[in-house]
Curated annotation (Swiss-Prot):
Keyword set includes Manganese: no
Transmembrane segments: none
One Pfam family hit: FBA_1
PANTHER family: BNACNNG10540D PROTEIN, F-BOX PROTEIN CPR30-LIKE
Keyword Repeat tagged: yes
UniProt xrefs under PROSITE patterns: FBOX (PS50181)
The protein, known as: Putative F-box/kelch-repeat protein At3g20710
Keywords: Kelch repeat, Repeat
Ranges for the Kelch repeats: 150-201, 293-341
F-box domain mapped to chain residues: 1-50
Length: 362
């Protein structure tokens, strides 16, 4: 029987086993395979495959290259954990260099990446092999803030632009219609600070503070209703915290939950429920350490099943860390005080990591 005559489900299963880096070659082989590889059910098979393997996927940006990176945690016989990191595919290389990732703010949502350049936006979908350049509406501002999400009713991706002196003027770009629009809703707050947002279930959440409030909070933009939600409480007291004291990081978990890491106490909370206007939290992990670890630029992810968190960080033992674009340390923290520091330059099965944008999901 020829491959073209095989049942659709069987072809999906076969193609889902093809490594990501070979998919483009597969698509060019047969029109039916090309159409099938862009089918949502085929994408879901890849999502399920990654979930079963327990592998975490990231987009890694170095000076000249962009890679797909797979990160795996392995439990050893003595209940310790080992970290292995694998380069899965090269997305952009020196040979076909495009400077869209250089000096860019890179935002991720559901497998799509938004690269924010001066007076230029670039949307990249590595899975489909698509790139789209978008001109923002004037006036341009160096403090303009962007977010990427999608309409849950239509599935269409949208770009949110916050601009103006207080970053409370809004524009929305709809990728399905290739057009900018001014939404009915506004941000009725003069924002003092908004950390780069995290996409979760099509919406974007920021760690934020406005000029009138004393406390920091979570702020959500709902891309389906095209409006901001009410400020959501964080799971800890904000008293005495500044931008750098009590530094916090956000991370999405399987497009279902949001995790927040408070660096100075090394406590991780995970949402039990999260919506644009409601949130509840529970402690996932607390690490009692003296002295505490100072982390400033780290990415982190958690493995709920193994009850482990992995934090990627720059080595701050010398002043060179301020100018080093790479993550060269990893901290693995778990239950019962488990803690392990990994030097990514010296450990087997690891490598020095460039800028990690996000955990990837199709």
């Amino acid at each position: 029987m020829m491959m073209s005559n095989l049942p659709k489900d069987l072809v999906e299963e076969i193609l889902s086993r093809v490594p990501f880096k070979y998919l483009r070659a597969i698509r060019s082989t047969c029109k039916n395979w090309y159409d099938l590889s862009k089918n949502r059910s085929f994408a879901n098979k890849n999502i399920d495959k990654a979930a079963v393997s327990g592998e975490k996927e990231f987009l890694m940006i170095t000076q000249f290259n962009v890679f797909w990176v797979g990160v795996n945690l392995h439990r050893s016989q003595n209940n310790s954990f080992d970290l292995s990191i694998q380069l899965k595919a090269k997305i952009v290389s020196r040979d076909k260099k495009d400077d869209l990732f250089q000096k860019s703010q890179v935002i991720h949502c559901n497998g799509v990446f938004l690269c924010v350049r001066e007076k230029m936006l670039v949307v990249l979908n590595p899975y489909w092999g698509q790139t789209k350049r978008i001109m923002p509406r004037p006036p341009f501002g160096c403090f303009d803030r962007y977010a990427l999400g999608y309409d849950k009713s239509s599935g269409s991706h949208k770009i949110l632009r916050l601009f103006g002196v207080n970053q409370n003027n809004l524009n929305i770009y709809d990728l399905s219609s290739s057009s900018w629009m001014i939404p009915d809703g506004t941000l009725e707050r003069d924002m003092e600070y908004m950390k780069q947002g995290v996409s979760l279930n099509g919406d974007t959440y920021w760690y934020a503070k406005d000029k009138e409030s004393i406390d920091w909070y979570l702020l959500c933009f709902d891309f389906t209703r095209e409006r901001f939600g009410t400020p959501l409480p964080l799971p800890f007291s904000n008293e005495g915290y500044t931008l750098h004291k009590g530094y916090k990081s956000l991370s999405a978990l399987k497009e279902e939950k949001l995790a927040v890491l408070l660096w100075d106490t090394m406590v991780i909370w995970v949402t039990n429920k999260i919506e644009p206007d409601a949130v509840s939290w529970s402690i996932f992990l607390k690490l009692d350490m003296e002295p505490s670890i100072y982390c400033r630029y780290g990415n982190f992810f958690i493995d709920e099943e193994k009850k482990v968190a992995v934090v990627f960080e720059k080595d701050s033992s010398s002043w060179s860390w301020m100018y080093n674009p790479n993550y060269n340390k990893a901290y693995i923290a778990g239950e019962n005080g488990y803690f392990k520091s990994v030097n990514l330059l010296k450990s087997p099965n690891t490598l020095q990591l460039g800028h990690l944008v996000c955990s990837y999901a199709l």
